[in-house]
Amino acid sequence: MSWSVLEALRKDPEILRENLRRRFLPLDMLERAIELDRKWREAVTELNSLRERRNEINRSIPRADPGEREELIRKAKEIGEEIERLEDVLEKLSQERDSILMSMPALIDDSVPIGPNEDYNKPIRFWGKPKVPRSKLDSFMEQTRGFNVEYELIDWEPLGHADELEVMLKQVDTVKAGQLAGSRFFYLFKDIVWLEQALILFALDKISRKGFIPVIPPYMMRRDYYLGVVDLNTFEDSIYKVEGEDLYLIATSEHPLVAMHAGDTFTEDELPRLYVGLSPCFRKEAGTHGKDTKGIFRVHQFTKVEQIVFSKPEESKYWHERLIENAEEIYRELEIPYRIVNIASGDLGASAAKKYDLEGWFPAQGKYRELVSCSNCVDWQSYRLRIKLDRKGRREFVHTLNSTALATTRTISAIVENHQREDGSVRIPKALRKYLEIFEQAPKEEIVPIEKILKE
């Protein structure tokens, strides 16, 4: 049983060098790991030789003459002391080597576009007929260059989601929430509460019908499990730690759902294992100062429905495509125009071998914005968490995949921009209406500004 990164380190370290180059990361730590592994293997060879020599001596002691026996016992003791020393050396070498290897990113897929940052992300397909305000036409044409995307040109300016929700509809309040908890928090009221619940039910219903098991996970995790699902050296600033406790609030249900199978071994007929998680998500949004400060698009707390797959290694590419297709179905039914983007090598997180983003069209901003992130993490997480596949005695690491199905606050933001009318009312997508009809107080077909209600 071998981890892809460790196997490459020993068989062809140039694979790892090239992987780091393609990710625009430094090579120095890798060279250190190669040297440590060389010393470790030399020490293992020496240790095995010493153990074999000690065993030979121990076997000869009972047959030796009394005078010779004492010398053999002395030699066996000396070898034993050397074995103990080498075992300590091996432990230190393996700890330092493995610490470096644990920081190594997943081997990226050959289909990933190469580039240092998000500017090199590659759109691969578009869906829908976006409403494009005349003032945003140039921006839209730039973002759809190379694709023949049909659009509807409009001569009025939709309100941005923040103003629509807080000023026009008056059903979100980030000011009061800010006084209570600080920036990037919010209150939802009335119809927007019902809309959020309908979105959750819609996504859970749709994904579970595809064979995914619904799960509500713990909302906190211990550090040693978090180390298994993310590169905590870079991610720790993004999550909340409980003061005085070895616990972190989860940033997504992906993390506890993947960690749920830590130490488990699957048989071939037990895979794929499919889950759809529902949880609040807590994020510091470190490094986003000044970005999306208004509204509920980028917040510290939100609810998300997440898809998780544990698969055989040879099937993970198939499941990666299925996961993004599931997300596309959701946003097609919500009638949100979108594009699918293949994320560039330099913009990938350490755990992902390949990632797609689904970016929804926001008419008021004139931009496609991220709504879904869909990653194939290959054996990066399973190695750390020791999640294995047993093929009739031959063991290997499973592959793990994750994808947003629906994040409520961003989806609400997309709905109020794309389904907004000139009078400020918002049409509710037909796909959500059956989840609202059962509640007497819930809106059914539209969300109406308070001023319009008072006039009527």
Curated annotation (Swiss-Prot):
Q: Decide whether keyword Nucleotide-binding is in the record.
A: yes
Q: Per the record, a Pfam family?
A: Seryl_tRNA_N
Listed GO CC annotations: cytosol
The GO annotation for biological process reads: selenocysteine biosynthetic process; seryl-tRNA aminoacylation
Q: Where does L-serine bind?
A: 252-254, 306, 404
Q: Does the keyword Transmembrane helix apply?
A: no
Per its UniProt record, what InterPro entries does this chain match?
Answer: aa-tRNA-synt_IIb, aa-tRNA-synth_II, aa-tRNA-synth_II/BPL/LPL, Ser-tRNA-ligase_type_1, Ser-tRNA-synth_1_N, SerRS_1_N_sf, SerRS_core, tRNA-bd_arm
Keyword terms of this UniProt record: Aminoacyl-tRNA synthetase, ATP-binding, Cytoplasm, Ligase, Nucleotide-binding, Protein biosynthesis
Q: Where in the cell is it found?
A: Cytoplasm
Q: Subunit structure, briefly?
A: Homodimer. The tRNA molecule binds across the dimer.
**Function field:** Catalyzes the attachment of serine to tRNA(Ser). Is also able to aminoacylate tRNA(Sec) with serine, to form the misacylated tRNA L-seryl-tRNA(Sec), which will be further converted into selenocysteinyl-tRNA(Sec).
What name goes with this protein?
Answer: Serine--tRNA ligase
Species of origin reads Korarchaeum cryptofilum (strain OPF8)
Name the gene behind this protein: serS
